Amino acid sequence: MFIRTENFQTFIRLYPVVTFILALQAVLWLFFSLPAHSVVLWRDTVTGYNLGVANGEWWRLITPILLHAGFTHLLFNSMSIFLFAPALERMLGKARFLLVYAGSGIIGNIGTYVTEPLDYVHVGASGAIFGLFGVYLFMVLFRNELIGQEHSKMIITLLAFAVLMSFINSNINMMAHLFGLCGGFLLSFLCVQKKERRY
């Protein structure tokens, strides 16, 4: 379920939404890494910035999901998406998977806006990724037949570790993680159908 054995072409064919997300955030990281002044201005316009949201720049609740602070940040989040997102795209379908992913990220950014000071600045897909864990948590609690006992234990262990690290690491947007997790869990009531089959 979480072990990728597909070749490149098969991965793209089976998981088009996941592929698009991975490619888009990589392209955006490369673009915004350019030292040009105009690029820096563009980045400042789409970065998560609570004061900007307060001034009506609502897109800042969406765009930070695709942005990253550095290569390590991008790599870690991309690996998390690569490992944990494909199974959900297959189980939920493209539309519902995208709803969960984007919805959780937006909910995480709304939570950041509500709880953090106005000068708070943030980027990253972590809220959306925690939303995926929220879906898995829903399955562990209510639809265990979809993932099985072994994967359930793995999810609980990984989630406990991730939440713990969110509290320990001061550079992590803890509110995006927690709100994203809750968002993914709640969206599961809408997106995880009774007819769903195990991956």
From Swiss-Prot:
Its EC number is 3.4.21.-. One of its GO terms (cellular component) is plasma membrane. Its main location: membrane. It is a multi-pass membrane protein. The active site is at S126 (nucleophile), H177 (charge relay system). One of its GO terms (biological process) is proteolysis. The chain crosses the membrane at residues 14-34, 65-85, 97-117, 122-142, 147-167, 172-192. The keyword Hydrolase applies. Pfam families: Rhomboid. Keywords: Cell membrane, Hydrolase, Membrane, Protease, Transmembrane, Transmembrane helix. It is found in: Cell membrane. One of its GO terms (molecular function) is serine-type endopeptidase activity. It comes from the Bacteria. Belongs to the peptidase S54 family. This is Putative rhomboid protease YdcA. It comes from Bacillus subtilis (strain 168).
